[in-house]
Amino acid sequence: MLKYLPAYLATIIFMFIVDLIWLSQIAQPLYQDGIGHLMAATPKLAFAAIFYLVFVLGLMWFAVRPNAQIKSVKSTFVAGALFGFFVYASYDLTNLALLKDWPLKLSIIDMTWGTLLSGTCALVAKLVFTKTNKT
Protein backbone atom coordinates (compact mmCIF):
# COMPACT_ATOMS: atom_id res chain seq x y z
CA MET A 1 0.00 0.00 0.00
CA LEU A 2 3.01 2.32 0.29
CA LYS A 3 2.99 2.61 -3.48
CA TYR A 4 -0.13 4.80 -3.09
CA LEU A 5 1.48 7.17 -0.56
CA PRO A 6 2.80 9.80 -3.04
CA ALA A 7 -0.59 9.93 -4.76
CA TYR A 8 -2.37 10.16 -1.39
CA LEU A 9 -0.20 13.04 -0.19
CA ALA A 10 -0.37 14.92 -3.49
CA THR A 11 -4.15 14.56 -3.54
CA ILE A 12 -4.51 15.88 0.01
CA ILE A 13 -2.48 18.95 -0.94
CA PHE A 14 -4.39 19.45 -4.20
CA MET A 15 -7.80 19.03 -2.57
CA PHE A 16 -6.93 21.33 0.31
CA ILE A 17 -5.75 24.12 -2.01
CA VAL A 18 -8.68 23.86 -4.43
CA ASP A 19 -11.24 23.53 -1.63
CA LEU A 20 -9.68 26.47 0.23
CA ILE A 21 -10.07 28.65 -2.86
CA TRP A 22 -13.65 27.44 -3.31
CA LEU A 23 -14.62 27.95 0.33
CA SER A 24 -12.88 31.28 0.90
CA GLN A 25 -13.35 33.00 -2.46
CA ILE A 26 -16.42 31.56 -4.17
CA ALA A 27 -18.76 29.76 -1.78
CA GLN A 28 -18.23 31.87 1.33
CA PRO A 29 -21.07 34.30 0.54
CA LEU A 30 -23.41 31.37 -0.14
CA TYR A 31 -22.56 29.79 3.19
CA GLN A 32 -22.80 33.12 5.00
CA ASP A 33 -26.24 33.85 3.53
CA GLY A 34 -27.56 30.34 4.06
CA ILE A 35 -26.04 29.18 7.34
CA GLY A 36 -24.10 32.17 8.66
CA HIS A 37 -25.80 31.87 12.04
CA LEU A 38 -24.27 28.38 12.41
CA MET A 39 -20.75 29.23 11.26
CA ALA A 40 -17.88 29.58 13.70
CA ALA A 41 -15.91 32.82 13.62
CA THR A 42 -12.76 30.78 13.16
CA PRO A 43 -12.73 27.32 11.53
CA LYS A 44 -11.52 24.42 13.67
CA LEU A 45 -8.52 23.45 11.55
CA ALA A 46 -7.78 20.18 13.32
CA PHE A 47 -11.17 18.80 12.32
CA ALA A 48 -10.72 20.10 8.78
CA ALA A 49 -7.36 18.31 8.58
CA ILE A 50 -8.94 15.07 9.80
CA PHE A 51 -11.66 15.43 7.16
CA TYR A 52 -9.12 15.78 4.33
CA LEU A 53 -7.04 12.84 5.59
CA VAL A 54 -10.08 10.56 5.90
CA PHE A 55 -11.86 11.73 2.75
CA VAL A 56 -8.82 11.28 0.51
CA LEU A 57 -8.17 7.87 2.08
CA GLY A 58 -11.70 6.86 1.06
CA LEU A 59 -11.19 8.31 -2.40
CA MET A 60 -7.96 6.32 -2.80
CA TRP A 61 -9.61 3.11 -1.60
CA PHE A 62 -12.87 3.31 -3.53
CA ALA A 63 -11.89 5.20 -6.70
CA VAL A 64 -8.16 5.11 -7.36
CA ARG A 65 -7.09 1.66 -6.16
CA PRO A 66 -9.73 -0.27 -8.15
CA ASN A 67 -8.80 1.68 -11.29
CA ALA A 68 -5.03 1.84 -10.79
CA GLN A 69 -4.20 -0.65 -13.54
CA ILE A 70 -6.79 0.60 -16.02
CA LYS A 71 -5.31 2.98 -18.61
CA SER A 72 -8.48 5.00 -19.12
CA VAL A 73 -8.93 7.88 -16.71
CA LYS A 74 -12.68 8.02 -17.32
CA SER A 75 -13.46 5.17 -14.91
CA THR A 76 -11.30 6.77 -12.22
CA PHE A 77 -13.04 10.13 -12.64
CA VAL A 78 -16.50 8.52 -12.55
CA ALA A 79 -15.65 6.44 -9.47
CA GLY A 80 -14.23 9.51 -7.72
CA ALA A 81 -17.21 11.65 -8.68
CA LEU A 82 -19.65 9.01 -7.42
CA PHE A 83 -17.73 8.67 -4.15
CA GLY A 84 -17.87 12.45 -3.72
CA PHE A 85 -21.55 12.59 -4.57
CA PHE A 86 -22.42 9.88 -2.04
CA VAL A 87 -20.34 11.46 0.74
CA TYR A 88 -21.50 15.03 0.14
CA ALA A 89 -25.12 13.90 -0.36
CA SER A 90 -24.99 12.04 2.97
CA TYR A 91 -23.97 15.26 4.69
CA ASP A 92 -26.32 17.59 2.83
CA LEU A 93 -29.40 15.37 2.85
CA THR A 94 -28.95 14.69 6.56
CA ASN A 95 -28.79 18.44 7.17
CA LEU A 96 -31.92 18.98 5.08
CA ALA A 97 -33.71 16.27 7.05
CA LEU A 98 -32.68 17.35 10.52
CA LEU A 99 -31.78 21.04 10.63
CA LYS A 100 -34.34 23.79 10.66
CA ASP A 101 -34.08 26.17 7.70
CA TRP A 102 -31.14 24.40 6.04
CA PRO A 103 -31.14 25.83 2.48
CA LEU A 104 -31.87 23.40 -0.36
CA LYS A 105 -29.93 25.63 -2.78
CA LEU A 106 -26.81 25.34 -0.63
CA SER A 107 -27.11 21.56 -0.56
CA ILE A 108 -27.47 21.32 -4.34
CA ILE A 109 -24.41 23.53 -4.85
CA ASP A 110 -22.44 21.62 -2.22
CA MET A 111 -23.27 18.20 -3.69
CA THR A 112 -22.35 19.42 -7.17
CA TRP A 113 -19.07 20.81 -5.88
CA GLY A 114 -18.27 17.63 -3.96
CA THR A 115 -18.96 15.51 -7.03
CA LEU A 116 -16.74 17.57 -9.34
CA LEU A 117 -13.97 18.07 -6.79
CA SER A 118 -13.84 14.38 -5.95
CA GLY A 119 -13.72 13.28 -9.57
CA THR A 120 -10.91 15.74 -10.24
CA CYS A 121 -9.02 14.66 -7.12
CA ALA A 122 -9.31 11.03 -8.21
CA LEU A 123 -7.73 12.01 -11.55
CA VAL A 124 -4.88 13.79 -9.77
CA ALA A 125 -4.31 10.74 -7.60
CA LYS A 126 -4.32 8.40 -10.60
CA LEU A 127 -1.87 10.61 -12.53
CA VAL A 128 0.53 10.79 -9.59
CA PHE A 129 0.15 7.05 -8.95
CA THR A 130 0.88 6.28 -12.61
CA LYS A 131 3.95 8.56 -12.67
CA THR A 132 5.40 7.16 -9.44
CA ASN A 133 4.74 3.49 -10.23
CA LYS A 134 6.11 3.04 -13.73
CA THR A 135 7.50 -0.41 -14.32
Feature-to-residue mapping (PLM):
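Juxtamembrane/disordered regions of integral membrane proteins
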Residues: 1-113, 117-135
